[in-house]
UniProtKB/Swiss-Prot annotation:
<keyword id="KW-1214">G-protein coupled acetylcholine receptor impairing toxin</keyword>
<keyword id="KW-0528">Neurotoxin</keyword>
<keyword id="KW-1213">G-protein coupled receptor impairing toxin</keyword>
<comment type="subunit">
    <text>Monomer.</text>
</comment>
<keyword id="KW-0629">Postsynaptic neurotoxin</keyword>
<dbReference type="GO" id="GO:0090729">
    <property type="term" value="F:toxin activity"/>
</dbReference>
<feature type="disulfide bond">
    <location>
        <begin position="3"/>
        <end position="24"/>
    </location>
</feature>
<keyword id="KW-0964">Secreted</keyword>
<protein>
    <recommendedName>
        <fullName>Muscarinic m1-toxin4</fullName>
    </recommendedName>
</protein>
<dbReference type="InterPro" id="IPR003571">
    <property type="entry name" value="Snake_3FTx"/>
</dbReference>
<keyword id="KW-1015">Disulfide bond</keyword>
<comment type="similarity">
    <text>Belongs to the three-finger toxin family. Short-chain subfamily. Aminergic toxin sub-subfamily.</text>
</comment>
<dbReference type="InterPro" id="IPR045860">
    <property type="entry name" value="Snake_toxin-like_sf"/>
</dbReference>
<keyword id="KW-0800">Toxin</keyword>
<dbReference type="GO" id="GO:0005576">
    <property type="term" value="C:extracellular region"/>
</dbReference>
<dbReference type="Pfam" id="PF21947">
    <property type="entry name" value="Toxin_cobra-type"/>
</dbReference>
<dbReference type="InterPro" id="IPR054131">
    <property type="entry name" value="Toxin_cobra-type"/>
</dbReference>
Amino acid sequence: LTCVKSNSIWFITSENCPAGQNLCFKRWQYISPRMYDFTR
């Protein structure tokens, strides 16, 4: 499973997140829906 994490608004990193995929994606989508769709 892939989880999207961000240290800042302009820097995006993807990491394996088997335990908290849903939480991580929901948090990222909440921060920036457009960037979330872009990373898909």
